[in-house]
Amino acid sequence: MLEGFKKFSQHNFERDVLNQKGLTVIDFWSESCVPCRQLAKILKQLVQEVPDSVTIGSVKVEDNIELLERFNIRTTPTLLFIKDGELVETRTGVDRRQVIKKLVETYA
């Protein structure tokens, strides 16, 4: 869904998210989720505005059940903010661009 963004899965999550320094924002999305498409548009705008040290990526929930269970994700879209391997914020639903940008600035 998020072309050009890092695609995370249960196979690379540990290496590419939890073992990395800096902030990673992960969008958990589903193909059948209309609000997920709205959030994807917001994230596409934000990727141009955030520092290079921030990684924005996505996880397709249908293919990554283990990650859903690990992070207790019950709805899509869900955004996880992970800083230096630690979960610092979880957001569900579609927030305004300014809200997400402020969270990125807070944790980056």
Label each PLM-derived region with a short phrase.
Residues 27-29, 81:
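Structural cue for short, hydrophobic secondary-structure segments
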Residues 23-24, 77:
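Alpha/beta-hydrolase fold active-site loops
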Residues 1-3:
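N-proximal helix/coil linker or "cap" segments that precede and/or mark the start of modular domains
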Residues 29-32, 75:
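Short pre-active-site segment immediately N-terminal to redox-active cysteine/selenocysteine motifs
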Residues 5-8, 28, 40-47, 51-66:
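Thiol-based oxidoreductase modules, predominantly thioredoxin-like and allied folds used
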Residues 32-39:
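Short, thiol/selenol-centered motifs that function as redox-active sites or metal-ligating centers
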Residues 75, 81-108:
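Non-catalytic, surface beta->alpha helical segment in thiol-disulfide oxidoreductase systems
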Residues 5-23:
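A short beta-strand-turn-helix
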